[in-house]
């Protein structure tokens, strides 16, 4: 393969030499390479991808010990070995080794878990590897772009990301978006023999090309090392920083108070004071927090993949959990995208033409390979798909693009005459044919008739090309006919939309079809018919009642929009974001990319173009809306795990810092830093399992509310600190436990008090996770077996230490099984109010605690279906009101809507509109018959024999 070394060394300018010389230099033809030749060239040029920087495993491992939380622990280790060297005692080697072990254990667990999650994520992303059509062994096949080599012939079509630097072969000019490479905002025209760059996007046209450079030798590859790889600090990282700073500030406050009291006022010994400071530093820092949250998110992304959603950006999970508006395409998402044509409804407008000829012309204007849904439906109506090209010679095919919205074929018939056939959007075909006003009115009447039945219209036209040239304008176009296309809704779409509304996600239909079709589809799916034409987005709607409504409010309250172009999608997302909505947007085409990138969660649907996938945050591998709603539920469960852990981490910091601070200052009892290390190690081992814990998703959109996290953490942590102080006071200054439980007093046994205090802190600290992980009573929501097992094992270890340990260096001596039983009982009794505190702080923070109390909407109930009765009553009232059985509901002085957030109002309004639409279905003959049958108790089979519905 030495003859190709000059290509690899780039000693030949393949961009400027004539195309004939390109083939000579690359030793190839327009028929492409053979598989063997391509394999040899792959060995010479390497894979068509950029070299990945391999991160050192050692540096990655050490990176887990290089963050603000780890720095605090490292300062504590230095204090144990340096500052603790005083008071006639040697350096605190045990604590130093313990802290280092804690850091190593945490880093090891984090390294293993994140490495596994990273491998899983890499495997998922491999499924999104760009693919391309390549000609090898004289056959076209779809292959991964990484196997391309110079000399390969590839096919480029609308929406493709160019896989390698290439020169265009014969064909029509392309429109190429090079903005990601050159910064040009307007697509540039590329003619045959021009070069196209790897990474640019085909915006219009279709052509074949020969690859001239791959991998690091491409224009993109050479520029890659110049790209600034500085990582932006995302919202998730800011949240972690805020929580970490809160914990560090809490510890700093405790340390300052201890320093001000212990040395100037109490005149404590230097070494004892250092030990107390170490307790706060070691016990208060949630050292495992960054790893737990990152691993939870990575593990969650794998679960999403199993449900048919690949996350390209991990932080999209938290945004998906907070999504309250979903703008979704009708075709393929709400419907099956399996079109059928009703031959009986075909309208013919050309004289002397039958319906079969309309079908034939439409089939000729369709592809017979690489078909889209419309092409497949049209060609499939023929008795034999080969009829589409029978007796004619194809000269040129004009592919579909979002601007022209039509396809066309130039062909020569058996008599040598040249013709063109075109099919496409009726409005585009009408303009093409330059139809008179009366014809337009007739066509629009047929279109409206189709639309009322939920049918899309496809216009067909023909033209004679007297010049007999493929680029000739030809004679006048003639409108031939209209075809009705029906795309049935998915069987699960209606139920999925209802689920979405109940989850607080307002689903808006975005369709390029007519308004009447959008309304009919919305009616069938029960999502409401409050839909508007795309002109309403620009304030051009003629309806005076809508004209007075601000565009932002119109978009917010609409159930959908029809006649939408890609630029309208961008405007919808932009306006919704201005109204503080977290907006999801689905898309599949190259022109959807700006809206997908603008949306908080860009979702590329199944079979989306490379450009749409590149701009999206989540790529679906399964069709339908149900995949998205399942992903929302999974994301909320993942987010709940992360939020619950952060509340737990803040609570533990408050509980350790203030609990031990008060004990140290009031009773001058010096808790052992080594025992705090044991608590921290056991805690981290247990908490690492939270990423796999079973979790109920939030019933409403959720997001990081730091005020709620800090408030809940302070209340729960403060309560636990108080219970520890009370326990120590009763144990040291009274005989309560010995009098009532028969255990020996410990007031004069500080080593055994250390053991008892250690066990009490360990049990109640770890048990707190069961409170923070549940939305209702903690005992009613069963945790995962892994979390439960880890808790049991950790507390068995803690109990055995408290009962049997005799470690002089840690100043601890076993307190016996009697005290262990007392401590477990005390911990159980003090655990019960934690749920009540959780409910209390939640209702106080919601701002409607008094209203909830008056209307009995509290969590202090054993009912499983919370709020079910009220929803059923609202449903019954809506039915009675609709049928005139009772007047419309009057406002209550405690109007629920006035107290709910605006987002909940919008979801509720959409839900009610959907309910009304479904209830209108009752006013049909079938609904009336079934109602009478139920009322009279008649035989339904007998009734159905006499009524045809």
Swiss-Prot record:
Domain of life according to the entry: Eukaryota
Pfam family, one: Cation_ATPase_N
Residues annotated with Phosphothreonine modification: 881, 948
Catalytic residues as annotated in Swiss-Prot or TrEMBL: 329
Residue(s) carrying Phosphoserine: 899, 931
One function term, GO molecular function aspect: ATP binding
Catalytic reaction list: ATP + H2O + H(+)(in) = ADP + phosphate + 2 H(+)(out)
Gene3D superfamilies: 6.10.140.890, Calcium-transporting ATPase, cytoplasmic domain N (3.40.1110.10), Calcium-transporting ATPase, cytoplasmic transduction domain A (2.70.150.10), Calcium-transporting ATPase, transmembrane domain (1.20.1110.10), HAD superfamily/HAD-like (3.40.50.1000)
PTM sites of type N-acetylserine: 2
SUPFAM superfamilies in UniProt: Calcium ATPase, transduction domain A, Calcium ATPase, transmembrane domain M, HAD-like
Organism encoding this protein: Arabidopsis thaliana
Quaternary assembly: Binds to 14-3-3 proteins. The binding is induced by phosphorylation of Thr-948. Binding to 14-3-3 proteins activates the H(+)-ATPase.
Ranges of the Extracellular topological domain: 82-93, 265-273, 666-670, 731-751, 806-813
Membrane topology (Cytoplasmic): 2-61, 115-243, 292-643, 694-709, 773-784, 835-949
Transmembrane residue ranges: 62-81, 94-114, 244-264, 274-291, 644-665, 671-693, 710-730, 752-772, 785-805, 814-834
Topology in the lipid bilayer: Multi-pass membrane protein
Annotated protein name in UniProt: ATPase 5, plasma membrane-type
Family as reported in the entry's similarity comment: Belongs to the cation transport ATPase (P-type) (TC 3.A.3) family. Type IIIA subfamily.
Tissue note: Expressed in guard cells and leaves.
CDD domains xrefs: P-type_ATPase_H
Binding site for Mg(2+): 588, 592
Subcellular location: Membrane
Record PROSITE patterns: ATPASE_E1_E2
InterPro entries to which the protein is assigned, alphabetical: ATPase_P-typ_cation-transptr_N, ATPase_P-typ_cyto_dom_N, ATPase_P-typ_P_site, ATPase_P-typ_TM_dom_sf, ATPase_P-typ_transduc_dom_A_sf, HAD-like_sf, HAD_sf, P-type_ATPase_IIIA
């Amino acid at each position: 393969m030495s003859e190709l070394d000059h290509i690899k060394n780039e000693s030949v300018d393949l961009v400027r030499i004539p195309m004939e010389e390109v083939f000579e230099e690359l030793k190839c033809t327009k028929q492409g390479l053979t598989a063997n030749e391509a394999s040899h060239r792959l060995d010479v040029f390497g894979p068509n991808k950029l070299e990945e920087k391999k991160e050192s495993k050692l540096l990655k491992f050490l990176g887990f010990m290089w963050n603000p939380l780890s720095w605090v622990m490292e300062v504590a280790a230095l204090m144990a070995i340096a500052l603790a060297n005083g008071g006639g005692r040697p350096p605190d080697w045990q604590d130093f080794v313990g802290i280092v072990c804690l850091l190593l254990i945490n880093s090891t667990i984090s390294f293993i878990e994140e490495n596994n999650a990273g491998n899983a994520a890499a495997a998922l992303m491999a499924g999104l590897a760009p693919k391309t059509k390549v000609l090898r062994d004289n056959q076209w096949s779809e292959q991964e772009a990484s196997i391309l080599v110079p000399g390969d012939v590839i096919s480029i079509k609308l929406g493709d990301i160019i896989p390698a630097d290439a020169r265009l072969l014969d064909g029509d000019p392309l429109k190429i978006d090079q903005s990601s490479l050159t910064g040009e905002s307007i697509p540039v025209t590329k003619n045959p023999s021009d070069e196209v760059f790897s990474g640019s996007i085909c915006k219009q046209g279709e052509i074949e090309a020969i690859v001239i450079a791959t991998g690091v030798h491409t224009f993109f590859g050479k520029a890659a090392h110049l790209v600034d790889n500085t990582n932006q600090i995302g919202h998730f990282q800011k949240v972690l920083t805020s929580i970490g700073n809160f914990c560090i500030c809490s510890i700093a406050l405790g340390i300052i108070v201890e320093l001000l009291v212990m040395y100037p006022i109490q005149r404590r010994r230097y070494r004892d004071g250092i030990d107390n400071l170490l307790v706060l530093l070691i016990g208060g820092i949630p050292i495992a927090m960054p790893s737990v949250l990152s691993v939870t998110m990575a593990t969650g992304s794998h679960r999403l993949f199993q449900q048919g959603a690949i996350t390209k950006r991990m932080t999209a999970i938290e945004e998906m959990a907070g999504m309250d508006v979903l703008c979704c395409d009708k075709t393929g998402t709400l419907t099956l995208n399996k079109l059928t044509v009703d031959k009986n409804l075909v309208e013919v407008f050309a004289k002397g033409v039958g319906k079969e000829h309309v079908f034939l012309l439409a089939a000729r204007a369709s592809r017979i390979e690489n078909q889209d849904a419309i092409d497949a439906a049209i060609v499939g109506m023929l008795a034999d798909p080969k009829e589409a090209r029978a007796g004619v010679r194809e000269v040129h095919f004009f592919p579909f693009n979002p601007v022209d919205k039509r396809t066309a074929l130039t062909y020569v018939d058996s008599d040598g005459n040249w013709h063109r056939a075109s099919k496409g959007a009726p409005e585009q075909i009408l303009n093409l044919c330059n139809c008179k006003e009366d014809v337009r009115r007739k066509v629009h009447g047929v279109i409206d008739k189709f639309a009322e039945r939920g049918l899309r219209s496809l216009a067909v036209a023909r033209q004679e090309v007297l010049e007999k040239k493929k680029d000739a304008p030809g004679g006048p176009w003639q409108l031939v006919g209209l075809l009705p296309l029906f795309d049935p809704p998915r069987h699960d779409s209606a139920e999925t939309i209802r689920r979405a509304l109940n989850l607080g996600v307002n689903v808006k239909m975005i369709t390029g079809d007519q308004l009447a079709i959008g309304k009919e589809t919305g009616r069938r799916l029960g999502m409401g018919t409050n839909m508007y034409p795309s002109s309403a987005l620009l304030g051009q709607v003629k309806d005076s009642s809508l004209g007075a409504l601000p565009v932002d409010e119109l978009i917010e309250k609409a159930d959908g929009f029809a006649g939408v172009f890609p630029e309208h999608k961008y405007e919808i997302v932009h306006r919704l974001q201005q109204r503080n909505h977290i907006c999801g947007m689905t898309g599949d085409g190259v022109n959807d990319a700006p809206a997908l990138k603008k949306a908080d969660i860009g979702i590329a649907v199944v079979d989306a173009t490379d450009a749409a996938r590149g701009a999206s945050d989540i790529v679906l591998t399964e069709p339908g809306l149900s995949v998205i709603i399942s992903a929302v539920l999974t994301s909320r469960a993942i987010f709940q795990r992360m939020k619950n852990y952060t509340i737990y981490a803040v609570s533990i910091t408050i509980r350790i810092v203030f609990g031990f601070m008060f004990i140290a200052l009031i009773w001058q009892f010096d808790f052992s830093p080594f025992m705090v290390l044991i608590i921290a190690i056991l805690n981290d081992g247990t908490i690492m399992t939270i990423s796999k814990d079973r979790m109920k998703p939030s019933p409403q959109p959720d997001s990081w509310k730091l005020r709620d996290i800090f408030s809940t953490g302070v209340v729960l942590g403060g309560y636990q600190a108080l219970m520890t102080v009370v326990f120590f006071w009763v144990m040291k200054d009274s005989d309560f436990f010995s009098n009532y439980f028969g255990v020996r007093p410990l007031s004069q046994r500080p080593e055994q008090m250390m053991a008892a205090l250690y066990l009490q802190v360990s049990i109640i600290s770890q048990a707190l996770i069961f409170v923070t992980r549940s939305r209702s009573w903690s005992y009613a929501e069963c945790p995962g077996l892994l979390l439960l097992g880890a808790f049991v094992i950790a507390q068995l270890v803690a109990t055995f230490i408290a009962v049997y340990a005799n470690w002089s260096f840690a100043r601890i001596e076993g307190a016996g099984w009697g005290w262990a039983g007392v401590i477990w009982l005390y911990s159980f009794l003090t655990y019960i109010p934690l749920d009540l505190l959780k409910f209390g702080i939640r209702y106080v923070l919601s701002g409607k605690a008094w209203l909830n109390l008056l209307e009995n909407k509290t969590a202090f109930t054993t009912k499983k279906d919370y709020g079910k009765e009220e929803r059923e009553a609202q449903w019954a009232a809506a039915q009675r009101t609709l049928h005139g059985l009772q007047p419309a509901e009057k406002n209550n002085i405690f109007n629920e809507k006035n107290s709910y957030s605006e987002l909940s109002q919008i979801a509720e309004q959409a839900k009610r509109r959907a309910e009304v639409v479904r209830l209108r279905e009752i006013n049909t003959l079938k609904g009336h018959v079934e109602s009478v049958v139920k009322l009279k108790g008649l035989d339904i089979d007998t009734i159905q024999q006499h009524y045809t519905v």
